[in-house]
Amino acid sequence: MVRKIFQTNAELKDWLSGQNSAIIFIPTMGGLHPGHQYLIQKAKEKKTNTNQIILVSIFVNPLQFSKGEDFKKYPRNIKRDAELAFSAGADAIWAPEYDEVFPGGADSHFKIEVPKTLHNQLCGAERKGHFDGVATVIIRLIKIIKPKKLILGEKDWQQLIIIRKLFQELSIPVKIESYSTQRDQSGFAYSSRNSYLSDSERVNAQSLPNAIKEAKTEFDKGKVINLTKIASIFKENNLKIEYLKIVDPFSLKETENINRLCLLAIAVKCGSTRLIDHTFLMHRKPIIAIDGPAGAGKSTVTKAFAKKLGFIYLDTGAMYRAVTWLIISNSIDPNDQAEIKNILKDSKLEFKNSSFVEQKIFINNIDVTEKIRSPQVTSMVSEIAKQQFVREVLTRKQQVIGNNGGLVAEGRDIGTAVFPDADLKIFLTASPTERAKRRALDLHKRGYEFSSIEDLEKEIKERDKKDSERKIAPLKKAQDAIELVTDGMNIEDVLKELIDIFRSKIPEEVWPTPNS
């Protein structure tokens, strides 16, 4: 493909009309640096076919600069920017003039007003109207380009949160992908404004990335971050603090709840140059809870999700099925709680060969991976799972496994009972009819006979009723869970949706996507 630089809408549209390609869009204001190149490289890596174009825009948006800010001196070097963009993998560059984006001027077009609850935090508290300008221009660019995917950096975290919220509320059908902040060898977050710093200012400004790194290290050791100490260091280095806060990463409001994902956010001025930086704070690796009724496809997609993102996979349903199999194989009455307690006390339950495809479950050194999927186990597992002692024993085992995080677990009560502090909770469900069809396919695949899909649907409804009405840890959607109805979706569709939801809650900086 011949690399192109366009300056007018007509040139861009004429070229795009002949491409028949989906556009991956990376908006910039120019002044490109290795952080921008990283976004372009990630976009290139994620291309799924040749019918995708990586388009980089270069447009210094006047609407996001207040009076007295650096609009006039913002770095502008289209030749250099084009070289950097193309060398990183861009297919085309769109560098429009103001009238191409706002024909007749900005006053001739609708303007977006960002909710004050988001705008007036952090950067927006000082830069009045800044994010209104960002939101307005991104809508204009999206309208002109019509991309399938938008690539953004996590360095401008507040901007990312606002654009995600904007697209969600306006139902804009563009997927947003974000990637972690990139830093130079000294720890500086790449920024177009770094070029403003004199040599002496650069020495003073080094205290910003140093403070970020030290605070993260101290937090990971279980120590309290001393904001007063950080402020003192900045003062010694002639940095004027605009904000220095620990905030909730989504509401952007100050928080003292450091047991959940937090954001240490900092903005300072070094001379006339404004610098921002942040780091995420998390006491453990993320825990993802996926709940839902029988037959919703939890096990299949959770395994795939764990493999894709590098999580430990915990199939809690298999644990209850293994205990049920043990009770059946020992001819124990499912209502004989004393005998069940007795056999469980000396039982050893473990997962082995934990590759994501071949994970097997053993009880008392017996591989029961296939045995626990029998209709006999399926019909009895609800009766066993509702017993308090059984749930207490298995819940403790599950919590021990998830003590350090880095885990995705699926079951009926993961988000409500096992990991109520999970960082993301999904309630995966489907209609009884859909689940009966899936169950029939699974039974046929495993070589089990069944009477009819109608009977399977009836059994599923009965199972749902039992699971929902049991007194101990009933099946229910956690208050803060996101519901995903999977009727008509294949495994790949569900997996993509889950990953999109995950990425809207867990930044790349916190849990990077493993290289395939």
Swiss-Prot record:
Stretch list, region Cytidylate kinase: 280-516
Entry annotated with the keyword Kinase: yes
Active site: H36 (proton donor)
Stated family: In the N-terminal section; belongs to the pantothenate synthetase family. In the C-terminal section; belongs to the cytidylate kinase family. Type 1 subfamily.
Reaction equations catalysed: (R)-pantoate + beta-alanine + ATP = (R)-pantothenate + AMP + diphosphate + H(+); CMP + ATP = CDP + ADP; dCMP + ATP = dCDP + ADP
Pfam family name, one: Pantoate_ligase
EC number of this enzyme: 6.3.2.1, 2.7.4.25
GO biological process: nucleobase-containing small molecule interconversion; pantothenate biosynthetic process; pyrimidine nucleotide metabolic process
Spans annotated as Pantoate--beta-alanine ligase: 1-279
Purpose of the protein: Catalyzes the condensation of pantoate with beta-alanine in an ATP-dependent reaction via a pantoyl-adenylate intermediate. Catalyzes the transfer of a phosphate group from ATP to either CMP or dCMP to form CDP or dCDP and ADP, respectively.
Chief location: cytoplasm
UniProt KW keywords: ATP-binding, Cytoplasm, Kinase, Ligase, Multifunctional enzyme, Nucleotide-binding, Pantothenate biosynthesis, Transferase
Gene: panC/cmk
Entry's Gene Ontology cellular component terms: cytosol
Domain of life: Bacteria
Protein name (database record): Bifunctional pantoate ligase/cytidylate kinase
Species of origin: Prochlorococcus marinus (strain NATL2A)
